[in-house]
Amino acid sequence: MPAETAPRVILASGSPRRRELLGNLGVPFEVVVSGEAEDSQETDPARLALELGQLKARAVAAQHPDAVVIAADTVVALGGTLLAKPADEAENAAFLRQQSGKTQQVYTGVCVISPAGEQSGVERTDVTFRALTEAEVTFYARSGEGLDKAGGYGIQGVGMALIERVEGDYSNIVGFPLALVLRLLRGAGVSAFGV
């Protein structure tokens, strides 16, 4: 699709990881952060991720109705308990202790809104942590790497060493499941990979 006819794409996220992954698809885009409060009474992690992704996309689409807006939200659940972004080093360490030797679920809700309508979906990936020593927990929590990430770890960094197994889409754990993103963008008429 020639650049002059390509739809304007807006990523409704301030996440550097989402910016990098969308950029890797060869999709020209701009960033507009929604600023919406991520408040919900929803307790089901898949529905919560979808609801928050839709909330962000709808807020930005209301300001830019001519654009294709994409937003996502990632939720981590362990045994039915939601693990948000840790507030500090102590909470990060507590999250890691909870996850040690266990399998968590990572859900990302993605919503694409274009002048033609709204499409959305949820991706789930299971992540199994190794049995962590207290020294590993302390070291990682002190690193600060997990402070801005749901579940308190960054799989694309040193946090990968905490993980024993991943079942599902790796990019989902980073917060932007590329296969789902690509399908939704194509459904809105957006080409990827420069074609």
From Swiss-Prot:
Transmembrane segments: none annotated. It is found in: Cytoplasm. GO terms for cellular component: cytoplasm. The keyword Hydrolase applies. The record marks R17, T74, Q156 as: Important for substrate specificity. GO terms for molecular function: dTTP diphosphatase activity; nucleoside triphosphate diphosphatase activity; UTP diphosphatase activity. Nucleoside triphosphate pyrophosphatase that hydrolyzes dTTP and UTP. May have a dual role in cell division arrest and in preventing the incorporation of modified nucleotides into cellular nucleic acids. This is dTTP/UTP pyrophosphatase. It comes from Deinococcus radiodurans (strain ATCC 13939 / DSM 20539 / JCM 16871 / CCUG 27074 / LMG 4051 / NBRC 15346 / NCIMB 9279 / VKM B-1422 / R1).
